[in-house]
Amino acid sequence: MDQQLKAVSKFLSYILRHRPEAISLELNAGGWAAISELIQCASKHDHFLSEEIIKEVVVSNDKKRFKLSEDGQYIRANQGHSIRVDLDLLPLTPPDVLFHGTATRFLASIMAKGLLPSGRQHVHLSASYETAIAVGRRHGKPTVLEINAQKMQGDGYLFYRSENGVWLTDHVPAQYFVEVE
């Protein structure tokens, strides 16, 4: 992804996941924004977007952070919101084991409190160890936690999967995970 697309992706993440009000944009209950309104609101705050650039970011983003509506007129972030949105996610049966990547400096707090959403709506989990390591590296020296998702679900915890394959849950108490690296 070139630098311009990366910058637009970061801007869209910030606006659609955390601060739509920063550009006077209103999202609907499902987190959707009209692309035309997004372009107009962004331009009033010196961020110049086009429908073509927005759609290119959606298509080229390797993490599939965004989704377009079927008619191509609306956009939303797939997950990671710190604002309340209803993503219409249905509970699903997760794989027996899921992973969470983090930095080792956060481990003591995580072991004491469990995995918390940390300002987001959900805790983000991965079906792959490799993805969890990559996520952990973004925050420093990585460590990976292996979550017993089968046991959690059996104990009544709900799991969801976002459009881009990230597994989500509200909280992971410490008794359901072990450090594997």
UniProtKB/Swiss-Prot annotation:
Top-level taxon of the source organism: Bacteria
What the protein does comes down to: Removes the 2'-phosphate from RNA via an intermediate in which the phosphate is ADP-ribosylated by NAD followed by a presumed transesterification to release the RNA and generate ADP-ribose 1''-2''-cyclic phosphate (APPR>P). May function as an ADP-ribosylase.
Q: Hey, which family's this protein in?
A: Belongs to the KptA/TPT1 family.
- Protein name in UniProt: Probable RNA 2'-phosphotransferase
A biological process (GO) of this protein is: tRNA splicing, via endonucleolytic cleavage and ligation
- Per UniProt, the enzyme's principal EC class comes to transferase
Cystines in this chain: none
The protein's matches in PANTHER family, at most eight in alphabetical order, are given as: PUTATIVE PHOSPHOTRANSFERASE, TRNA 2'-PHOSPHOTRANSFERASE 1
> Keyword annotations for this protein?
NAD, Transferase
Q: Which GO terms describe its molecular function?
A: NAD+ poly-ADP-ribosyltransferase activity; tRNA 2'-phosphotransferase activity
This enzyme's EC code(s): 2.7.1.-
